[in-house]
């Protein structure tokens, strides 16, 4: 009996080793988490059927004289029996996969056992089916609670399964005397070994999945902490100052040697090893980063040569580089470096991928918030500059004066003033409006200004109908026209022309132009215009700065406000995508 126990322990040990190996394969771990899906059930059927077949093939042959022999057997003599770990594999299949998997594995294992032959081989087909169904029932109960049977319960179920096996041998064997003799030899070793094996098998599954859950919990905590600490900086946009703070936070919270963030063209920040030559404001040094920016796909490398840094003393030996996206376009990279290649594991890769997705979302949210603030600022500045009490009362006084002279004209101006107020308020709630709406708002504004200063300036709007649904930021043309009226024609009472036009730039873009014949912009202010606030006698220039930021934020740097200025006048223009709002 002791010899049989030791031989069975060897077989169980083999099963346990294979179980441990499987549970350290990510695909199999994911399979265990999806065990209630039919696809996963069929895969579990195949895996546990292979376990069951191996249990049959590596069984211990017992003859009538109780002689034991262990090898790999495909066929057995008619007068011998087989002690094996088949019950363990069928039982675990049912506990993990439920009745379907347990029954399937039981049938496959039983049919193969009948094929192998031996004394009363049909008994083991019957017992295998019973064991699969009963183990599957206990597995189903655990599945409904979204759990696995406990280790102690698994051991008890293993004992019950072996007792069913012994009862089947006693009930269905033709030679009762031989059945009793066989049971007296194998019952205790098989009950002990297979129940312990079942408990160990289930403990490996439970502990591995629990360890993964704990790891995910730690990762989730780290990611949430990173999100909370980095979000305020992402709201500022991806610049050198914010990137430096973000890189420092990641370096402090993660086990990495260095962290770098780049834009599409330059290093924005580098914290940690290699910071002596990976210097912010420099062009991107590594070919690895350039490849990621070009392909838009994550890359992981484990050698200095693959990183592609040309500095001879660079300590960086492994890296993972993740693209950062905004609205589907690559805007930069997040790079994590390691001085020891062994520190870059599957866990770091998963965490890096998750961070890249989160950071890309934060960049988009930050940009959306920036646009919202800019739009609100545009509304406030527009209302302050154009709907100020001074503007309002001047318009009302003009209309009042016209009531006595030209009541129809006064009525028209009152409607224009009403429309102007309404359009300003509506524009403040949208990121883009149609060019047609923008021009209507401009016409309302011009009607009021021309009523106050008759004949002082001429406005020519030359826009083809096919462009009237092009989407533009609110106040785009209004700000440029107002800028010309306020600054271009100082002390000039007549001959002041402003031209507004839209022309085709490319098949997918249009150029929007506002041109005046004023005195031009002084050279000391030209390089500042649109980039920062410019103080003047009649304003700060912040409206143009705000407009330029909104254009670049909505459409990219290629849409930035551009201008040319001479003593004969100034031309402002921007190039926007030919995006049209469909007419209802």
UniProtKB/Swiss-Prot annotation:
Its EC number is 2.7.13.3, 3.1.3.-. It is found in: Cell membrane. It catalyses: ATP + protein L-histidine = ADP + protein N-phospho-L-histidine. Residues 311-362 form the GAF domain. GO terms for molecular function: ATP binding; hydrolase activity; phosphorelay sensor kinase activity. The modification Phosphohistidine is found at residue 390. GO terms for biological process: cell wall organization. Keywords: ATP-binding, Cell membrane, Hydrolase, Kinase, Membrane, Nucleotide-binding, Phosphoprotein, Transferase, Transmembrane, Transmembrane helix, Two-component regulatory system. Autophosphorylated on His-390. The chain crosses the membrane at residues 6-28, 40-62, 88-110, 123-140, 155-172, 184-206. The keyword Repeat does not apply. GO terms for cellular component: plasma membrane. It is a multi-pass membrane protein. Pfam families: 5TM-5TMR_LYT (PF07694), HATPase_c (PF02518), His_kinase (PF06580). Residues 363-580 form the Histidine kinase domain. The keyword Zinc does not apply. Member of the two-component regulatory system LytR/LytS that regulates genes involved in autolysis, programmed cell death, biofilm formation and cell wall metabolism. Also participates in sensing and responding to host defense cationic antimicrobial peptides (HDPs). Functions as a sensor protein kinase which is autophosphorylated at a histidine residue and transfers its phosphate group to the conserved aspartic acid residue in the regulatory domain of LytR. In turn, LytR binds to the upstream promoter regions of target genes including lrgA and lrgB, to positively regulate their expression. PANTHER family: SENSOR HISTIDINE KINASE YPDA. This is Sensor histidine kinase/phosphatase LytS. It comes from Staphylococcus aureus (strain MRSA252). The lineage of its organism: Bacteria, Bacillati, Bacillota, Bacilli, Bacillales.
């Amino acid at each position: 009996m002791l010899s049989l126990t030791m031989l069975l322990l060897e077989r169980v040990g083999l099963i346990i080793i294979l179980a441990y190996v499987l549970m350290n394969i990510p695909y199999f771990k994911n399979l265990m988490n999806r065990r209630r899906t039919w696809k996963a059930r069929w895969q579990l059927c195949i895996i546990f059927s292979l376990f069951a077949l191996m249990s049959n093939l590596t069984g211990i042959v017992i003859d009538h004289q109780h002689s034991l022999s262990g090898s790999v057997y495909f066929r057995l003599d008619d007068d011998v029996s087989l002690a094996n770990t088949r019950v363990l594999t069928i039982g675990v299949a049912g506990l993990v996969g439920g009745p379907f998997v347990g029954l399937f594995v039981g049938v496959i294992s039983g049919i193969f056992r009948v094929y192998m032959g031996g004394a009363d081989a049909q008994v083991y087909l019957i017992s295998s089916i019973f064991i699969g169904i009963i183990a599957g029932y206990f597995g189903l109960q655990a599945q409904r609670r979204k759990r696995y049977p406990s280790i102690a319960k698994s051991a008890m179920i293993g004992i019950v399964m072996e007792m069913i096996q012994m009862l089947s041998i006693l009930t269905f064997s033709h030679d009762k005397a031989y059945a009793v003799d066989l049971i007296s030899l194998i019952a205790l070793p098989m009950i002990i070994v297979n129940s312990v094996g079942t408990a160990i098998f289930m403990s490996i599954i439970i502990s591995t999945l629990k360890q993964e859950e704990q790891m995910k919990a730690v990762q989730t905590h780290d990611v949430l902490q990173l999100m909370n600490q980095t979000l305020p900086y992402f709201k500022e946009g991806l610049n050198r100052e914010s990137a430096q703070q973000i890189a420092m936070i990641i370096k402090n919270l993660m086990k990495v040697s260095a962290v770098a963030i780049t834009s599409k063209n330059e290093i924005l920040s580098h914290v940690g090893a290699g910071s002596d030559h990976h210097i912010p404001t420099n062009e991107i040094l590594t070919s690895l980063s350039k490849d990621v920016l070009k392909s838009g796909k994550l890359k992981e490398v484990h050698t200095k040569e693959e990183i592609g840094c040309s500095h001879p003393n660079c300590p960086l030996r492994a890296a993972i580089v993740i693209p950062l996206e905004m609205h589907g376009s690559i805007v930069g990279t997040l790079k994590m470096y390691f001085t020891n290649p062994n520190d870059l594991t599957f866990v770091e890769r998963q965490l890096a991928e998750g961070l890249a997705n989160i950071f890309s979302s934060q960049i988009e949210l930050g940009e959306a918030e920036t646009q919202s603030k800019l739009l609100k600022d545009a509304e406030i500045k527009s209302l302050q500059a154009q709907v100020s009490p001074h503007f309002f009362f001047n318009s009302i006084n003009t209309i009042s004066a016209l009531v006595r002279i030209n009541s129809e004209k006064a009525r028209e101006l009152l409607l224009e003033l009403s429309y102007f107020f309404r359009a300003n308020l509506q524009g403040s709630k949208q990121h883009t409006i149609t060019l047609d709406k923008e021009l209507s708002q401009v016409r309302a504004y011009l009607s009021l200004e021309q009523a106050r200063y008759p004949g002082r300036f001429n406005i020519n709007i030359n826009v083809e109908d096919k462009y009237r649904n092009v989407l533009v930021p609110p106040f785009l043309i209004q700000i440029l026209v107002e800028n010309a009226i306020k600054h271009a024609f100082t002390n000039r009472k007549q001959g002041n022309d402003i031209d507004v036009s839209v022309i085709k730039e490319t098949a997918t873009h249009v150029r929007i132009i506002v041109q005046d014949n004023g005195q031009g912009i002084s050279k000391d202010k030209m390089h500042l215009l649109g980039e920062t606030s410019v103080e003047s006698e009649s304003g700060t220039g912040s409206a143009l700065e705000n407009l330029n930021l909104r254009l670049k934020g909505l459409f990219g740097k290629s849409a930035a406000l551009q201008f040319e200025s001479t003593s004969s006048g100034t031309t402002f223009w921007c190039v926007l995508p030919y995006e049209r709002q469909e007419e209802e």
